[in-house]
Amino acid sequence: MHDMKKLDNLKHLDKGAPEAMKAFWAFDKAAFAEGALTGQVKQLIAIGVALTTQCPYCIEIHTKAARDAGATDAMLAEATLVAAAIRAGGAVTHGAHCF
């Protein structure tokens, strides 16, 4: 499905657009820093988004980070179901455009 080693190719973005990528990595670090939300909660949100966007790299990376932050199977299950509900809800509410 995916090969995590492919992420090594991000170095080409770092070399090709160094200022933009430096800004991206700084933004990413700041977004996941502890704040009003704990790191664990942020990782659970990231899992929900990754499941919705269906990014296998993000799913793997953020699941590991969430587990490292103490997330349980029950937390991961609930995050998964929230993502599923949001995705399904989007289809249902967009159905209003059919009428």
What role is predicted for each listed range?
Residues 1-43, 67, 93-99:
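Acidic, glycine/proline-rich low-complexity segments that act as flexible tails and inter-domain linkers
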Residues 19-21, 60-75:
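Iron-sulfur (Fe-S) cluster-binding segments and ferredoxin-like electron-carrier domains
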Residues 35-53, 74-81:
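Immediate flanking context of iron-sulfur cluster ligation sites
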Residues 55-58:
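Short cysteine clusters
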Residues 72-99:
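C-terminal structural segments of small proteins and small subunits
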